[in-house]
Every structure is written in C-alpha cells, then in structure tokens.
Amino acid sequence: MSIVRMTDLDLSGKRVLIRQDLNVPIDNGQITSEQRITASVPTIKLALEKGAAVMVTSHLGRPKEGTWSEEDSLAPVAARLTTLLGLDVPLVRDWVDGVDVAPGQVVLLENCRMNVGEGKDDEALARKYAALCDVFVMDAFGTAHRAQASTHGVIRFAPVAAGGPLLMAELDALAKALDNPAKPLLAIVAGSKVSTKLELLSNLVNKVDQLIVGGGIANTFIAAAGHDVGKSLSEPDLIPTANQIVADAKARGAEIPLPTDVVVAKQFLPDAEASVKSLDQVDADDLILDIGPQTAAHYAELIANAGTVVWNGPVGVFEFEPFSHGTETLARAIAASKAFSIAGGGDTLAAVDKYAIAKDVTYISTGGGAFLEFLEGKTLPAVAALEARGQ
C-alpha cells in the first residue's frame, strides 16, 4: 500500500486538517454513544504532540447543504472533545475561506456536509479545503467509500495527503484478513436478504475456504438445496443465484456448509415458542429464526480450526432470547479462537457488545458501508486517492 502515513510525517509548525468520522447519535442535544469521538482522540493528540496547528472536521447526519441547523451541529461533539482532550476546542461555523489556529491548538470545523458542493465532490470546494492546510489527514474509514469534497477531492489538492492511524489500522486489518490470510479463511455472512449481500457473497466465495451463511440469506440457500423453509424470510427468485454461488465454491474446493437443524417458531415474537427441528421436519407454517444446536456446534468447530475469521451478521434473530443461541455460540467460538478475527457491520457490533467479546476479537471494524464495500472487492475512492498521492 503506497499511502503516506501521518505517523511518519514531521508536523512541527504545520497546519493539519484531519477528516474524522464524528457522526455520533445525538438525542435532544445529548450524545448517546461517543465511541467514534473516543476513537478519534489519539489521532488528534498525536498531531498536537508533533507540534501541529490542528483543524478537525466531520459530517453529522444529513443536513441540507447551504443551511445551518442546530440539530446537525457538531457543538455537542466540540464540548465532548474539550473534556476528553483537556483543552478548549472551539467550534468554527464559517470556515471554508480561512481558519485561525496556532500550533498546540485544536479547532473543530462545523459539519462539512453543510458546505455547498460537499456531496458532489465539487472541485472548487475541495481546493478551498486544501488551501487551509499544509497536511490533510484522512482518518474516517467509515466514509472512505464516498467520493465527497472532504473525503476525496481535498486529497487530490492538499500539499500533502496522508492516511491517519484509524484509517490505516482498518486497512491493515482488512488486508491481513483478505489479501494475505492465515488459512483456512472462514467468513460468516448473515442478514435478511441475499440481494443486499449478493456482491459480498460473490466476491468472498472466490477467496474463502468456508463460507457460513445465516439469517434470511441461509433460508434462500436451504431452499436452493431443495428443503422446505415454510413461511421463513427467503428470496425464491434468487435460488438460481444461490446455486451458482454454491457451484463456484465447489469448483475451487471451498465449502458452504448448510444447517442440519434449525430453531423454528410459528410467530415472529420475542416470546414465541421455539422448537428445534431437523431440516426435513420444517412445516409449511414454520418460521426459521436461528440455527440449531447441532449446527452451531459444527460451525463453532470450523471456527476453532480457522486461521482467519471474517464476521458480518448474526446468524439468527439474536435480539429475541429464544433465537439468540446460535449467534452466541459462534460469537463465543470466535472469542475463544486463536484465529485472526475481524468483525464489522451494525448488527454484528451489537452482538459483540451483547456477549462482551470485544477484547477477544482481533479487530472490530467501525466502517459500516465502507467495510462491506471493501469485502465486496470494490475500490474505495478515498483509499484510491491516497494511493495515487503516495506514488
């Protein structure tokens, strides 16, 4: 990877503009999860320690360009950064045409999505961003898949463009998992629909040794194998696609193990009566809501023997206690495994939290959409721009 790293640069006396992902949930002016803010602090501290004059910006929500609104303001984030850094972090509202900041100071530049031209990667705006700094640092992996003025255009025009520690840690972990994995490489891909994870499945099937499918996705694969899935969520029109993915796996000696037993209910309710059935016992009015204990034990054994595990999606309706055991079994197997493990996606992170295994997963991706697009084999605009500047 030819990307210039912020950690390698002399920043003494330099004006440094850092694009962070500070898009945190805010309810009535109160931040309800500050994980992204906390994650950004080491990068800001590093820039300060290196003697830089630090400017930080981020998006928050989806404001209308050209209009300021309190609900989309980074004001609560500035207050939290002031506390976490132990120094005053003023919020600058109109900043595109110039910012006053001295070495040793930090300013937070108001929500960049309020700037006209941000979303369309406007060149004139990107050049103005670039003119604010000596060094631009892209540290927001979660927006690396968006070609916008603050995530792409500015990289082209800044005097120096570098990858920040958070972004580089994410790219290093993903490269380790996919480009040069310890074998066997096992991926868990679960979710409600094959259609939303189709590109992901099609890309991973050419890389992995084992591909475990879960949730509604698994139901489509179960139906493709000729089993009745009752009234479970599935996509009959994608059965030929599922068969093709299975054939592709088989052709290169990879395996897509299907459940042998499942947990079913008659209703989709948190307290629905759950029963374990083998695949051939599923009734026409059954809903498959989790993998069965026999299947979970088999999958856990595969995880225990894996060299690398990529996890995207819970394998059952883990929010409902009777249908949470499959996901819990796999989560605990990943935690106990010696494999290099990477987990990402909103529901996956909720499962990691629920079973308190964060410290036992090698790398937790906060990237969301960018994580998925990387797994799909797509080029991320911000990464491509940084690589071009690093040549």
Swiss-Prot record:
One of its GO terms (cellular component) is cytosol. It holds the Pfam family PGK. It is an enzyme of class 2 (transferase). PROSITE patterns: PGLYCERATE_KINASE. It comes from the Bacteria. One of its GO terms (molecular function) is ADP binding. Its EC number is 2.7.2.3. Keywords: ATP-binding, Cytoplasm, Glycolysis, Kinase, Nucleotide-binding, Transferase. One of its GO terms (biological process) is glycolytic process. Belongs to the phosphoglycerate kinase family. This is Phosphoglycerate kinase. It comes from Xanthomonas campestris pv. campestris (strain ATCC 33913 / DSM 3586 / NCPPB 528 / LMG 568 / P 25). The gene is pgk.
